[in-house]
Amino acid sequence: MAAILSAVALAGCEEKKTGGEAEGKYETLKLKYEGSVGTVTYPELAQDLGYLDPIKLEWIGNTISGPASIQNAATGETDFGGAFNGAIAKLIASGAPLKSVIGYYGSDEDTYMGYYVLDGSPIKNAKDLIGKKVGMNTMGAHSEFILKEYLKQNGLTEDEIKQVTLVVVPPVNTEQALRQKQIDVAVLSGMLRDRALDNGGITKLFSDYDLFGSFTAGSLVFTERFIKENPNTVKKFVEATAKAIEWTRTTPKEEVIARFESIIEKRGRKEDTETIKYWKSPGIAEKGGYIKESEFKVWVDWLEKGGEFKNGQVKLDDLYTNEFNPYKQEIENK
């Protein structure tokens, strides 16, 4: 963590383009970011729909880890990143000067994170997970938080929870790892989950939707310095991303999928578009990715109860802002 914060300090010393160096009213016309294999992020969709013009995204690679994504934003390797809200709270609490600006993924009845076992598995409940391996995309983020909450709600002690082994598996390999019995439980979400279900032979043990209902789970972040120096660019980015989220909500599913397939094919990263056809919904609870205080509070409270945060160590207002969201007034005036 010290290395990350040291890099944050160095990133803060870098010069950023000012208004005079960028065209028009935007402080910078280029935003560095990481993508995700075989999927389309909302900023990428916003760019393709023309909502982000004249600002352009500069892809520097892919990530499968939310914590790594926001660390890269904190150190200046990228201009923005995204992660589970609990992971964002932990990094900000450690001293990283980040601010969440818009929700970008979550769970609803169609789009959720499920924990799956093979048909016929002896694992039927939380107690059965003791001594077993659970495969997930990264540690310290959504998958781990939800699993531990499930175990706690079902009466496991801290010592018993420690006996459940977490194994990092790239999302595209998780289904295969389960079927080959390299893991006992697979954490699957979105299109990869639906493809695995289509292939048959797996059963849901539980899901985050079962525990919490519909909720926005993760946010996109910028550093506070970037926001201060590039407020018009950040405002345009949030507006464009919010509009892209709502475009997927109001556009026929087939049209959304076709657009995603087109974006993946055009960018030429040698990706499989097969899983995109399983897209169902944005999974974001509030209009335009508006962030509700409760979507951070639940995880801050959880971390305080677990002893990772001291009571009052993290102020919710320090974690996020809705000031750039075009739907802010509409939502708050309801």
Regions found by a protein language model. Give the residues of each.
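Conserved C-terminal helix/tail region of periplasmic/extracytoplasmic solute-binding proteins
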Residues: K297-K334
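Stable alpha-helical elements in mature extracytoplasmic
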Residues: T39-Y42, S65, S69, F84-A87, ...
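Short, low-complexity disordered leader/linker segments with a strong preference
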Residues: M1-K30, Q329-K334
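A ligand-binding cleft/hinge motif common to bilobed small-molecule-binding domains
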Residues: N85-G95, L147-K148, D184-I202, W302
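Short, glycine-/small- and polar/acidic-enriched structural segments
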Residues: E21-T157, Q163-V167, S214
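Pocket-lining segment of extracytoplasmic ligand-binding domains
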Residues: V167, V172-I263
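Secondary-structure end/capping motifs
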Residues: K228-K310
